[in-house]
A protein has these predicted regions:
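A boundary/linker detector
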Residues: 1-82, 95, 172-225
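Cys/His/Pro-rich metal-binding microdomains
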Residues: 74-75, 135-139
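Histidine-centered nuclease catalytic patch
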Residues: 78-133
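Short cysteine/histidine-rich zinc-coordinating motifs and their immediately flanking basic loops
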Residues: 83-94, 148-160
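Residues immediately flanking
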Residues: 91, 140-141
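Short, compact, well-ordered microdomains
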Residues: 143-146
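Eukaryote-specific, cytoplasm-facing alpha-helical/coiled-coil scaffolding segments in long proteins
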Residues: 164-173
């Protein structure tokens, strides 16, 4: 979204700011692009997802996360890899499909060669830069999250690992209405959750790693003027 900007607050943290002087701009593929065809675009995204999930780097990143102490199910709490299979879920806001879409738009916006391997390499690099939000969950919980009938199981933002604001800063101008609506709806949904506060500065700390970031109130980043 081109009407979402970032700026540093008094503490030096990057925060999101909605520019009310501009309208909503949705960046789309041009009609002469092969990937403007829905079937071709979906085939591209699925292939990129497959390359990522099967890569050595992807497995190495999951190991890095689990070795750092993030090795328990974010929902069930006491379930570790020793008791049941713990999997890495992309969320709670953006899925791996979303990340491929956003990366694809970035390549297009910057007139860069578009290929599944280039997109996969960028997304894997973003994983290791801790820009991609992931949540560790048990296999059964993971299946429940992806169940299309599920409308109650939501993962708290504080349970995720990854710098959301840093990602939005890097890829500003590459989000379409669907992505921004996901962000908006998730924050709106969790505004009433009393278990955690989404609207204050967050310090995500796992062992010796500290990553501060701030999530603005929903009225500051809503997608309508």
């Amino acid at each position: 979204m081109k009407n979402v900007k970032t700026k540093k607050n008094k503490d030096g943290n990057l925060v999101l700011e909605y520019d009310k002087t501009s309208g909503m701009y949705i960046t789309l593929m041009t009609s002469d692009s092969k990937l403007s065809n829905t079937n071709e675009r979906h085939r591209f995204i699925k292939k990129t997802e497959s390359i990522i999930r099967k890569s050595i780097q992807y497995k190495a990143y999951k190991k890095k996360i689990m070795d750092s102490g993030i090795n328990m199910c974010a929902v069930l709490g006491n379930v570790t890899n020793e008791k049941a299979k713990v999997e890495m879920h992309h969320g709670p806001i953006f899925t791996l499909w979303d990340y491929v879409e956003i990366t694809l738009q970035y390549l297009y916006n910057n007139n860069l060669p578009i290929s599944t391997f280039r997109a996969a390499d960028m997304i894997l690099s973003d994983h290791f830069d801790d820009l991609i939000q992931v949540v560790m969950v048990s296999e059964s919980v993971h299946k429940a999250i992806h169940n299309p009938t599920n409308n109650t199981l939501k993962i708290p933002l504080e349970s995720a690992w990854g710098n959301l604001v840093g990602y939005l800063e890097k890829y500003k101008g590459c989000f379409d209405y669907k992505h921004f609506a996901k962000l908006n709806d998730y924050l709106e949904l969790n505004k009433t959750n009393t278990d955690f506060d989404l609207f204050k500065t967050k310090i995500t700390e796992w062992k010796d790693v500290k990553m501060p970031y701030e999530i603005l109130k929903i009225e500051d980043i809503r997608h309508r003027q």
